[in-house]
UniProtKB/Swiss-Prot annotation:
<keyword id="KW-0028">Amino-acid biosynthesis</keyword>
<keyword id="KW-0057">Aromatic amino acid biosynthesis</keyword>
<dbReference type="GO" id="GO:0005737">
    <property type="term" value="C:cytoplasm"/>
</dbReference>
<keyword id="KW-0808">Transferase</keyword>
<protein>
    <recommendedName>
        <fullName>Phospho-2-dehydro-3-deoxyheptonate aldolase, tyrosine-inhibited</fullName>
        <ecNumber>2.5.1.54</ecNumber>
    </recommendedName>
</protein>
<dbReference type="GO" id="GO:0005739">
    <property type="term" value="C:mitochondrion"/>
</dbReference>
<dbReference type="GO" id="GO:0003849">
    <property type="term" value="F:3-deoxy-7-phosphoheptulonate synthase activity"/>
</dbReference>
<dbReference type="GO" id="GO:0005634">
    <property type="term" value="C:nucleus"/>
</dbReference>
<dbReference type="GO" id="GO:0008652">
    <property type="term" value="P:amino acid biosynthetic process"/>
</dbReference>
<dbReference type="InterPro" id="IPR013785">
    <property type="entry name" value="Aldolase_TIM"/>
</dbReference>
<dbReference type="GO" id="GO:0009423">
    <property type="term" value="P:chorismate biosynthetic process"/>
</dbReference>
<dbReference type="GO" id="GO:0005829">
    <property type="term" value="C:cytosol"/>
</dbReference>
<dbReference type="Pfam" id="PF00793">
    <property type="entry name" value="DAHP_synth_1"/>
</dbReference>
<comment type="function">
    <text>Stereospecific condensation of phosphoenolpyruvate (PEP) and D-erythrose-4-phosphate (E4P) giving rise to 3-deoxy-D-arabino-heptulosonate-7-phosphate (DAHP).</text>
</comment>
<comment type="similarity">
    <text>Belongs to the class-I DAHP synthase family.</text>
</comment>
<keyword id="KW-0539">Nucleus</keyword>
<comment type="pathway">
    <text>Metabolic intermediate biosynthesis; chorismate biosynthesis; chorismate from D-erythrose 4-phosphate and phosphoenolpyruvate: step 1/7.</text>
</comment>
Length: 372
């Protein structure tokens, strides 16, 4: 769809006081319409409500399992998402006594500079930015995966897209670049599911701890209704929140020493000691082959009785590594099957033993607690 150009056209004209750097606006399909076109099935509804309750129970120490958010760094093809879900489902069922498995299914990607921003923003991978198409593709994918029996996790990047997808999510994350943002803290206070805040890109945890405290309170903010109208939104606050350790510029922060320090920081702020650890990003030193090492360390801490670790994140795809995806027409046809086009991921073959080890660690912790 071509942009609807403003009177100022494609030139910068200081005589115009507003929208000088905006080329134009295209209509956005209302969330209410998309939800009606692509509704939630009864099977999906049960998967979503049950998994939300399970995650809440784990956070509140009413369930001694851990949450495992595992899946591709980003989704560029809905078919690959379903193919991955078909690998994940049997393993999730097998380990459900120890792990609450949620599939990572990220639709939008924050970029350090520029680059492909995700399935919603550019579903064709050609710079056409067919956002209305991307919204429908993404919602159908979410419906398909949840109907298959897999709960979903995604990152919250703006306060409009959740109106299209939040009813299908069981878990949300606020990324390292946006944890300090007031807008994202307000958004998290409105979401109907648990939300984790990552530590800052510099590795410090203070911004995430502040975010958890702020999100627990009600907020009044600018928002958009499902009909697409600008609105003043009032939130209840969200106490189902926790910190996600992802490492940073100063190095990894997944080891027992860092976890103990963060636990003390949370307690000092009068917050529950709930810690999820990301095996990727700064904790893997941006090398996907380090993720199993990180996971092994986390499992060992759990075996040793650490109850503050409530979850783990793993960037995993069907096949390992990553590939470049130049944004141009026809690029989709040239991509390798099941390989990430954003961050490098471990393969499914590498992922399955990581899940087994984490499950065994939870069972060992459970047995030790019973013995004591």
């Amino acid at each position: 769809m071509s942009p609807v150009f403003l009177p100022s056209g494609e030139t910068y004209d200081q005589e115009h006081l507003d929208d000088n750097r905006v080329l134009g606006y295209n209509p956005l399909v209302p969330a209410a319409l998309v939800q009606q076109e692509i509704p939630v099935s009864e099977t999906s509804r049960k998967v979503i409500t049950d998994s939300r309750k399970e995650i809440q129970a784990i956070l509140n120490k009413q369930d001694d399992r851990i949450i495992v958010v595992v899946g591709p760094c980003s989704i560029h093809d809905p078919k690959l998402a379903m193919d991955y879900a078909k690998l994940l489902k049997p393993k999730a069922d097998e380990l459900q006594d120890a792990l609450c498995v949620v599939m990572r299914c990220y639709l939008e990607k924050p970029r350090t500079t520029i680059g492909w921003k995700g399935l919603v923003n550019d579903p064709n991978l050609d710079g056409s930015f067919a956002i209305n198409k991307g919204i429908r593709m993404a919602r159908q994918m979410y419906c398909d995966v949840t109907n298959f029996g897999i709960p979903l996790a995604s990152e919250m990047l703006d306060n409009i897209s959740p109106q299209f997808f939040a009813d299908l999510l069981s878990f949300g994350a606020i990324g390292a670049r946006t944890t300090e943002s007031q807008l994202h803290r307000e958004l998290a206070s409105a979401l109907s599911f648990p939300v984790g805040f990552k530590n800052g890109t510099d590795g410090t945890v203070g911004v995430a701890i502040d975010a958890i405290g702020a999100t627990a309170h009600p907020h009044t903010m600018l928002g958009v209704t499902k009909q697409g109208l600008a609105a003043i939104t009032m939130t209840r606050g969200n106490k189902d929140t926790f910190i996600i350790l992802r490492g940073g510029k100063k190095g990894p922060n997944y080891d027992a020493e860092h976890v103990a320090a963060v636990r003390k920081d949370l307690e000092k702020a009068n917050l529950p000691p709930r810690i999820m650890i990301d095996c990727s990003h700064g904790n893997s030193s941006k090398n996907h082959l380090n993720q199993p090492k990180v996971s092994k360390s986390i499992a060992e801490q759990i075996r040793n009785g650490d109850s503050s670790i409530v979850g783990v994140m793993i960037e995993s795809h069907i096949n390992e590594g990553r590939q470049d995806a130049p944004i141009r027409p026809g690029v989709k046809d040239t991509l390798k099957y099941g390989v990430s086009i954003t961050d490098a991921c471990v393969s499914w073959e590498q992922t399955a033993p990581m899940l087994d080890d984490l499950a065994e660690a939870v069972r060992a912790r459970r047995q030790n607690q019973k013995s004591n």
